[in-house]
């Protein structure tokens, strides 16, 4: 229903007839391929394979399934997502039993992750409860595996949240295994109903009672919290787990490379900064897992024009603490000679000035690695790589 007008009817496809459910006694499954039915003097499409596409918001295509549909091995929402639906809505009457809410929560979130979609789950509440069944009104809005907002049960609470439809669209385009929706639409006999969607004003967004689940942020009508540090969890335990996981992944990758090449020596340019420090810790972990003596780790500190006592002392302390070999090679004279060779002004601190030092350090590391028969450990980070630049 949109603006007081019925634009499509989606029937239930899977009817439960077990435990407390006996729907198949009185009902039959709805048809998949849409047919036209008459409603209030107008022809309206009816069928499970209906898509509602917003012509004013290209990334918004809505499909629907009913209650039990999402609990079956092959839910209709799978076909809907493959046909192009970015948001799936589920009108449900799922009764309460002990522990069912947690299963229901995981089910909705996992379905949104599998389909790379938004999933809006609206469940029956107190007004639908009878002497046979109790409905808790557990409403959930999930996006690509993340629960954006969930209502508290048994208090008839409404919820709302923002979905990043452009991100969902981008994720699907990135996945080569997510098929072209046109073929799925044709195969499933899908009918697309066009509708328009007026943008919600800031005032109306703020006026909605979100019960502190999606309060608006200052300066805009965005209801969801946008984490300024998305890769760094705020919860300390989760953050520690994430850091441990990152170190383990990197160490395992380096371990495999050391095993494959038969190298028992590693060379690191240790500046005392963050990136080279983490690279050293990863290397130490990889060596320990292979039971290779840490003395096979060669830390090279190469002071030049911008080196401070603090970073130099950090490098020396780190190498000593982990039991690695430390070697100092001052590259100031070599870089100065290079500037003279190319006629570069020493007082001109431009890209050439900075990169010449980095290139000289790399040459030193490569040569030492050749001498000891080892591998140079890269100290570049993902931010550099994203910008097309590497240490």
Residue ranges and their predicted role:
Residues 89, 264-270, 274-316:
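ATP-dependent adenylation/pyrophosphate-handling site
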Residues 263-276, 332-335, 381-385:
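A glycine-rich phosphate-binding loop feature that marks nucleotide/adenosyl-phosphate handling sites
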Residues 93-94, 124, 271, 302-305, ...:
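Short, ordered loop/turn segments at secondary-structure junctions
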Residues 89, 95, 116, 336-348, ...:
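Nucleotide-activated chemistry modules centered on ATP-dependent adenylation/adenylyltransferase
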Residues 66-70, 94-101, 232-244, 301-308, ...:
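Hydrophobic alpha-helical scaffolding
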Residues 1-269, 285-294:
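Enzyme catalytic cores with a strong preference for nitrogen-chemistry domains
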Residues 160, 208-227, 292, 296-352, ...:
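A conserved beta-strand->alpha-helix junction
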Residues 111, 249, 253-261, 273, ...:
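Generic, well-ordered alpha-helical scaffold segments in large soluble proteins
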């Amino acid at each position: 229903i949109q603006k007081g007008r019925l634009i499509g009817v989606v029937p239930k496809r899977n009817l439960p007839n077990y435990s407390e459910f006996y729907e198949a006694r009185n009902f039959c499954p709805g048809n998949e391929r849409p047919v036209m039915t008459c409603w209030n003097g107008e022809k309206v499409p009816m069928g499970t394979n209906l898509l509602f596409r917003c012509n004013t918001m290209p990334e918004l295509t809505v499909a629907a399934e009913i209650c039990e549909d999402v609990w079956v091995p092959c839910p209709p929402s799978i076909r809907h997502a493959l046909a192009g639906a970015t948001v799936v809505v589920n009108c449900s009457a799922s009764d309460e039993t002990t522990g069912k809410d947690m299963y229901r929560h995981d089910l909705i979130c996992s379905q949104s992750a599998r389909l790379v979609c938004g999933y809006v789950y609206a469940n029956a509440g107190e007004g639908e409860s009878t002497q046979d069944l109790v409905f808790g009104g557990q409403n959930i809005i999930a996006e690509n595996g993340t629960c954006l907002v969930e209502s508290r049960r048994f208090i008839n609470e409404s919820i709302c949240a923002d979905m990043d439809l452009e991100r969902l669209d981008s994720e699907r385009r990135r996945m080569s295994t997510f098929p072209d929706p046109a073929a799925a639409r044709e195969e499933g006999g899908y009918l697309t109903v066009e509708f328009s969607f007026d943008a919600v004003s800031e005032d109306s967004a703020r006026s909605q009672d979100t019960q502190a689940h999606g309060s608006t942020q200052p300066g805009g009508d965005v209801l969801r919290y946008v984490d300024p540090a998305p890769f760094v969890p705020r919860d300390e335990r989760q953050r520690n787990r994430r850091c441990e996981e990152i170190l383990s992944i990197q160490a395992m990758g380096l371990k495999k490379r050391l095993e494959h090449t038969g190298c028992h020596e590693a060379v690191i340019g240790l500046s005392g900064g963050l990136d080279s420090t983490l690279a050293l810790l990863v290397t130490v972990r990889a060596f320990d897992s292979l039971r290779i003596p840490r003395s096979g780790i060669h830390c090279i500190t190469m002071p030049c024009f911008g080196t401070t006592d603090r970073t130099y002392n950090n490098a020396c302390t780190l190498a000593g603490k982990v039991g690695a070999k430390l070697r100092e090679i001052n590259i100031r004279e070599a870089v100065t000679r290079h500037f003279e060779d190319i006629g570069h002004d020493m007082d001109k601190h431009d890209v050439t000035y900075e990169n010449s030092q980095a290139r000289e350090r790399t040459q030193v590391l490569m040569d030492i690695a050749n001498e000891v028969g080892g591998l140079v450990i890269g100290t570049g980070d993902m931010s550099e790589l994203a910008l097309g630049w590497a240490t």
